[in-house]
Amino acid sequence: MQNAKDSFYMALRSRLAAINPVRTILLRGTVRPGILVEEAEAPFGQLPNDVFVLRWLGLGVDLDLGSTMVAEQCEIVYQSCGTQSFGGLDRGRSLSEMDEELIAMAQPFYTPKLNYATTPPTTMLTKVFWDEPGFGSIAIQRDLLSRSAKLMVYSYQEQGE
């Protein structure tokens, strides 16, 4: 499933860079698109604002098909306290903008599966696909608005995975 998870993340990352090139994060001295995988980073004291954070939650396997299909639930968490220039009063607009970006990043609902353990990445035989994100309600914590969206990511296991 690691190849599917990596391919899903890289697809969202490249799509975000095209949709909103201004949404970035400085991470380990490098500016990159504002999306990251929580399990691949050092632990946070608090999640970064105005960044999409991917969390992998649960794994399922269907062995009754001709090929083994695996599925893992992905939660995408994001939050905003607005901008300083508006004193944070635009935090709702900022969160809505991130909602729209997430909807756009998720489409189309598939991407080629690549093996990122090799340089350059190797294209595999199958695709990674997912369903529409299901959005949770907005959580309010003082000046911070946050939301999470969940979706299932699917992939057929290939030989050697």
Where are these regions (language model features)?
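Charged, amphipathic alpha-helical segments and their flanking helix caps
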Residues: M1-E161
